[in-house]
Regions:
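Sec/Tat signal peptide C-region and signal peptidase I cleavage site
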Residues: 14, 26-32
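Classical Sec-dependent N-terminal signal peptides that target proteins to the secretory pathway
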Residues: 20, 24-26
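Bacterial N-terminal signal peptides that target proteins for export
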Residues: 3-17
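Flexible loop/hinge segments at secondary-structure junctions
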Residues: 31-331
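N-terminal leader/targeting segments
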Residues: 3-5, 24, 33
């Protein structure tokens, strides 16, 4: 999570002290998250038209669609095409020039960055657009309250790099009793094209290998649907895909440590161990402006209206200080 720390760490802690408008229900669920009032409304400019192609993250797919819808209300002559098949599809699309926008739910890897530099001679630019708590979901009827990351590793990984040797196969091994004790764990996850797959592998599985029994799904919504329909299901996805059929459980970084709910306050403070920054990568040549349509679309995303869409879609908005830093990258 080094990218996240370098992008938002100190600013987020300051934002809490400054009193970001955060409300959490007594059950710890996400509730009443509001956009930082210091984020400015979007200011429409003249002369914006043309086409934008976005290829990348499935996690960001709905957000991109909502942002595009709002942006087209400002600029009806703009066409935005969005394809969300996974974060790994973004870097090659930017290199090939088939997309101007590369949404990713994880930071770009060095070899992906190097491929862009090799072709264009300058580095690709990542713009933070929203925050996310990568949630571990269970069925709404499941009584489990919390897990540690070592336990999550022992559930999903066959290599057990998190430190627990025991191979968890039933809910009873995780402390559930009665009718739940003998129910087998039913694992749902993303496929390898997904940035969420890679992020979870690195941070929850300590870079270990997934079990062969994980039912890989093509999208975040499919993971949540699987857990909804399978009473003994457990899966991972961005918090924005939460539905009434599942619950996101509290997580702790270590065995015996206090568990934190995946809410805004805990993401900002760093208490929730699977928080991340959602990004849009662009090929911005040094000392040259992006095309007006690409620049204005990103400015819209980083405006009051754009961050309100983040909240509407169930994700977490950026503090104003972070927005200012991201906007500066567009200059």
């Amino acid at each position: 999570m080094m990218m996240q720390k370098s992008l938002i760490g100190k600013s987020l802690k300051k934002a809490i002290v400054a009193g970001c408008l955060v409300a959490v229900t007594t059950t710890g669920a996400l509730a009443a998250v509001e956009v930082d009032p210091k984020i400015a409304p979007y200011k429409k400019v003249s002369g914006v038209s043309g086409n934008l192609d976005s290829i990348g993250s499935d996690t960001l797919n709905n957000l991109m669609a909502y942002w595009a819808e709002g942006f087209r209300k400002e600029y009806p002559n703009v066409r935005i095409q969005i394809e969300g098949k996974g974060s790994t599809t973004a870097p090659p699309a930017l290199v090939a020039g088939t997309a101007q926008l590369g949404p990713m739910s994880r930071p770009m890897k060095k070899d992906e960055e190097d491929a862009f530099v090799s072709k264009y001679g300058y580095k690709v630019t990542g713009i933070g657009v929203a925050l996310d708590s990568l949630a571990v979901f269970v069925n709404k009827d499941n009584p489990i309250k919390s897990l540690s990351l070592p336990q999550v590793d022992a559930i999903f990984s066959k290599t057990h790099k998190g430190g627990i040797a025991e191979d968890y196969k039933t809910w009873g091994q995780l402390g559930l009793t009665g009718e739940w004790a003998n129910l087998p764990l039913s694992l749902f996850g993303r496929n390898s094209a997904s940035g969420t797959y890679g992020f979870f592998k690195e941070h929850a599985l300590a870079k270990g290998d997934y079990k062969d029994t994980v039912k890989e799904q093509p999208g975040s919504a499919s993971v949540v649907m699987g857990v909804t329909e399978d009473r003994s299901g457990i899966g991972y996805s961005g918090i924005g895909y939460k539905t009434s059929g599942v619950k996101a459980i509290a997580l702790s970084a270590k065995e015996g440590a206090p568990a934190a709910e995946p809410n805004y306050e805990n993401v900002l403070s760093g208490k929730y161990p699977l928080s991340r920054t959602l990004l849009i990568y662009v090929g911005k040549e040094p000392n040259k402006a992006l095309s007006p349509v690409a620049a204005e679309f990103l400015k819209y995303i980083l405006s009051k209206e754009g961050q309100e869409i983040v909240v509407k879609d169930g994700f977490l908005p950026l503090p104003a200080e972070v927005v200012e830093k991201e906007l500066a990258k567009l200059n």
